[in-house]
């Protein structure tokens, strides 16, 4: 059954202007259901009662839904008696109007087309209503900053879109699903060179074997305590995707300026000590040659976008991601550093609900654009009090919603951070705490902090040879 979405405001439109509507389409939808009640299932996912312009039509549609909820069939007599018992029959024109709806419906077989007309007119009215709200906010700001008014306007427009967007076509017969599945398997089996990687390669062999790559529409959480290297690890994933994929990578760096991110990437790909790059001191001819080679890689394939705006809202981030997506015909990967630095207007008094809204919006973005979204996250300090300081899912700060929304959760643990005499110096564990469509477990990587780089554990070759 269709449900009303309370996010869409119900405001009166400007007086003297008739809002978009089609009484004929509304009558044909209602009449079609009365003539052939089975058609309810064809249109109930498309419409809600508030989509009807005429008040009587809203009542009729709502009471049809209520009839079905009580397990009663929809027909002329049942509906009329149901309305009469609630003292609503006269509000809809009585039995005569219901009979007229049944009599004057042009073609029951076209009911889906009529429903689409009703839905589209309702969307136009929603847009007009939101526009009026925005105009009113602009005339009387009530102390709001322009940035907040703009964010609220975009949120309301997106709410209309989100209300109407469905992620699938409803129930499908297993034969149709099986056919698509076999086609997908056959395509993968005939594609050479993917080595079982069905998503965006991480650049790390052992991790790719565990995950089959970073999958489209997945929300991927990378979490660690400070100094473990979560930004370095996430940027390594982005660098690999940017240089190997046909479509660009978009990085939202809410904590670090774009130039610092770029310095880290130069150190990572050039294998030049990042302290030399950061200070400009001690660089020899060999270092400059390596840096020049890396710059050539980016010049030949400028596939990395960095937005270092701080305090982004989900609406702002989504808008910017859509723009880059549209301008480039797609994206291969989105990374957010880090989730807790985002803000969601309207949730200032409840941090848990704010994080839930941010997490939900990032997952929605991944599904909308069909792109893997990596979000870095902080961990609770309480794990520092344990003997085994390897993170688990419950260590995620404001963990409930993040853990629920994530498709893949990866923690970074380096024993040498806690144990000065560790036998695993220069080794990092990538702990897969959750994987919706794959195994959990651990992967060991080499950590080369001076280069701002993680590597396959036994790897000593020059990574630039890959690109």
From Swiss-Prot:
GO cellular component, one term: cytosol
Reactions this protein catalyses: Couples ATP hydrolysis with the unwinding of duplex DNA at the replication fork by translocating in the 5'-3' direction. This creates two antiparallel DNA single strands (ssDNA). The leading ssDNA polymer is the template for DNA polymerase III holoenzyme which synthesizes a continuous strand; ATP + H2O = ADP + phosphate + H(+)
GO molecular function per UniProt: ATP binding; ATP hydrolysis activity; DNA binding; DNA helicase activity
Binding site for ATP: 224-231
Pfam family, one: DnaB
InterPro entries per the UniProt record, alphabetical: AAA+_ATPase (IPR003593), DNA_heli_DnaB-like_N_sf (IPR036185), DNA_helicase_DnaB (IPR007692), DNA_helicase_DnaB-like_C (IPR007694), DNA_helicase_DnaB-like_N (IPR007693), DNA_helicase_N/primase_C (IPR016136), P-loop_NTPase (IPR027417)
Keyword Chaperone: no
Any one of the GO BP annotations: DNA replication, synthesis of primer
Domain SF4 helicase: 193-461
The enzyme's E.C. designation: 5.6.2.3
PROSITE patterns in UniProt: SF4_HELICASE
Family: Belongs to the helicase family. DnaB subfamily.
Main function: The main replicative DNA helicase, it participates in initiation and elongation during chromosome replication. Travels ahead of the DNA replisome, separating dsDNA into templates for DNA synthesis. A processive ATP-dependent 5'-3' DNA helicase it has DNA-dependent ATPase activity.
Oligomeric form and interacting partners: Homohexamer.
Protein name: Replicative DNA helicase DnaB
Taxonomic lineage of the native organism: Bacteria, Pseudomonadati, Pseudomonadota, Gammaproteobacteria, Pasteurellales
Gene: dnaB
